[in-house]
């Protein structure tokens, strides 16, 4: 398909990304997710995007900021004695789902913001013990100081150790123990509610050798077992990576996706289905003495000019308002080519990109997020999704499809694109479908099998009752993955519908719940949301008029969509069992 590029739009997007390439240092760091009316009382918490999937406001009577494990024990003990509900919050709060929320208004937020220190680094044993509030960026830096490296991790370094453990965060690999951070942990110190004789709080020391059952429950805990205080990582000697991006057509992608991860240790893909293209990441481990001082400073994670971000968001809103699919496809083509040309932010020496392969040390290549690493500038610049500006606002559907089903799943998506080639340009405006490899994990709530994780980011309206252009196509993809191929949702991402009945997909769920009942019999660290996703009480879906528009439910009648705006509940186009909000011609002419 050939698109005509409007000069004004081309210039706008081009200037935006030229600025991004040049601008790497000055930015306003994200706000604290916890806000209180007076001191540390009468508080609310949100995520870094400023809205949870159901757009609710999460409240608590107080927030505590312990600075040591002893202070953490005191906080948990006092709340346990008082029978108060507790949830843990982090410095940046990047989980989309409501994992930070406690019930009602009388609960307690426990922030790990100041629990961010290295406890011990042992270069000989190749282990490092850190506090749970340490960010991934800090962990990478501290490990490198003693010549060590974490082999696999998420690409965004603004996550905390506790946050990664709580949600099962991962990078991309089928090699070794796989790409999940929690599978490179050897010991966890956790503070849980205790009995009267224990002073109402108990420090639990968990490891794969001494307490394997409890350890496997705590590795991905959703925060319902207590507060992780410290984590000990099993690290590796520093190594280098050699990375090359290649863009190809997607004609044989179904087959390549199944085998590519066995050939390259850190392989991943960025799929652009409406363009019929795939960006292959050929990324392999090389010896530490290999020449090269490369750096990966991912362009979308750099600081952005707030005014430019606002213009881009306004443009996307206008395209939605006037159903301008061509405009979205033009923008997607420009953005994907503009990101690919400078290698997504790779440089051969930390300054410029001169060509492939880019070789650099693991600590310089594995993760980035320079928009966090900055001074205050009055929001002239910010991370692109900062909720204080008119920036990116999106849904994120992130699902791990078993590797044995990936070929069929990709074929189904291609079948949808054949029906309407423009249907997925909107997600390509958000860089395309990121696909990362994961393996089975001994963690009870970790991945069940080798899989490919499909990370799909797409437009979200500020008005929850506003339908999206071609939303039925993305809804069908979501339901194909979840129900036809039994995909697992990422615990920290996704819309509500992904979590109904999800606990039945985990073979070790009963073992996890048994540990939960032992550690916190009164459910003080549980919430309505965790009870729903763990299958204890209620459902994650919220059924009401318009609920399917934001993934709060799967539509079963027209009222769950937007009938007044021409969107009715209809079967899927490829997967007939799907129920999606489809715009029906003749109902209404414009949104």
UniProtKB/Swiss-Prot annotation:
GO terms for cellular component: membrane. GO terms for biological process: L-ascorbic acid biosynthetic process. Coiled coil: none annotated. Residues 56-238 form the FAD-binding PCMH-type domain. Pathway: Cofactor biosynthesis; L-ascorbate biosynthesis. Its EC number is 1.1.3.8. One of its GO terms (molecular function) is FAD binding. Gene3D superfamilies: 3.30.465.10, 3.30.70.2520, Uridine Diphospho-n-acetylenolpyruvylglucosamine Reductase, domain 2. It catalyses: L-gulono-1,4-lactone + O2 = L-ascorbate + H2O2 + H(+). PROSITE patterns: FAD_PCMH (PS51387). Keywords: Ascorbate biosynthesis, FAD, Flavoprotein, Oxidoreductase, Signal. Its cofactor is FAD. Residues 1-27 form the signal peptide. NCBIfam families: pln_FAD_oxido. This is L-gulonolactone oxidase 2. It comes from Arabidopsis thaliana.
């Amino acid at each position: 398909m050939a698109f005509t590029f409007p000069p004004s739009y081309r210039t706008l997007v081009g200037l935006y990304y030229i600025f991004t390439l040049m601008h790497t240092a000055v930015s306003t760091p994200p706000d604290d997710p916890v806000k209180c009316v007076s001191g540390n009382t009468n508080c609310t918490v949100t995520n870094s995007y400023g809205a949870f999937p159901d757009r609710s406001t999460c409240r608590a009577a107080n927030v505590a900021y312990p600075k040591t494990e002893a202070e953490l024990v005191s906080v948990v003990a006092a709340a346990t004695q008082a029978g108060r509900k507790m949830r843990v919050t982090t410095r940046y709060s990047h989980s989309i789902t409501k994992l930070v929320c406690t019930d009602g208004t009388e609960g307690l937020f426990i922030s790990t913001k100041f629990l961010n220190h290295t406890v011990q680094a042992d270069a000989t044993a190749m282990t490092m013990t850190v506090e749970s509030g340490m960010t991934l960026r800090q962990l990478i830096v501290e490990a490198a100081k003693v010549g060590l490296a974490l082999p696999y991790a998420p690409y965004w370094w603004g996550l905390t150790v506790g946050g990664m453990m709580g949600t099962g965060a991962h990078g991309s690999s089928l090699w070794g123990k796989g790409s999940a951070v929690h599978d490179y942990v050897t010991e966890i110190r956790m503070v849980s509610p205790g009995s009267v004789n224990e002073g109402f709080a108990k420090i639990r020391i968990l490891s794969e050798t001494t307490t394997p059952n409890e350890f496997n429950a705590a590795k991905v805990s959703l925060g319902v077992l207590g507060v992780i205080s410290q984590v000990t990582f099993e690290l590796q000697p520093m190594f280098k990576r050699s990375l090359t991006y290649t863009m190809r057509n997607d004609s044989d992608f179904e087959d390549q996706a199944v085998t590519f991860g066995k050939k390259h240790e850190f392989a991943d893909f960025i799929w652009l289905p409406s363009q019929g293209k795939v960006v292959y990441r050929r990324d392999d481990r090389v010896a530490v003495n290999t020449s090269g001082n490369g750096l990966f400073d991912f362009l979308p994670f750099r600081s952005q000019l707030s005014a430019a971000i606002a213009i881009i968001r306004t443009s996307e809103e206008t395209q939605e308002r006037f159903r301008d699919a061509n405009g979205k496809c033009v923008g997607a083509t420009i953005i994907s080519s503009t990101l690919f040309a400078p290698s997504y932010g790779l440089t051969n020496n930390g300054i410029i990109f001169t060509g492939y392969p880019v070789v650099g040390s693991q600590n310089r290549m594995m993760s980035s997020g320079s928009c966090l690493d900055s001074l205050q500038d009055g929001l002239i610049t910010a991370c692109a999704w900062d909720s204080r500006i008119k920036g990116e606002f999106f849904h994120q559907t992130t699902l791990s499809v078993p590797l044995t089903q990936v070929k069929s799943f990709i074929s189904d998506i291609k079948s949808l694109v054949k029906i309407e080639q423009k249907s997925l340009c909107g997600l390509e405006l958000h860089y395309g479908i990121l696909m990362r490899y994961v393996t089975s994990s001994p963690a009870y709530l970790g991945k069940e099998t080798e899989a490919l994780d499909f990370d799909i980011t797409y437009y979200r309206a500020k008005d929850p009752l506003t339908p999206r252009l071609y939303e039925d196509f993305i809804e069908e993809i979501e339901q194909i993955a979840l129900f036809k191929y039994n995909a697992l949702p990422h615990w920290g991402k996704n819309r509500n519908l992904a979590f109904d009945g999800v606990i039945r997909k985990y073979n070790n769920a009963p073992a996890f719940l048994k540990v939960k009942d032992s550690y916190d019999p009164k459910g003080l660290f549980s919430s309505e949301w965790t009870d729903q996703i763990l299958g204890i009480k209620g459902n994650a879906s919220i059924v009401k008029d318009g609920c399917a528009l934001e993934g709060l439910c799967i539509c079963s009648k027209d009222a769950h969509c937007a009938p007044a705006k021409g969107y009715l509940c209809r079967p899927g186009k490829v997967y007939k069992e799907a129920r999606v909000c489809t715009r029906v011609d003749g109902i209404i002419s414009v949104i």
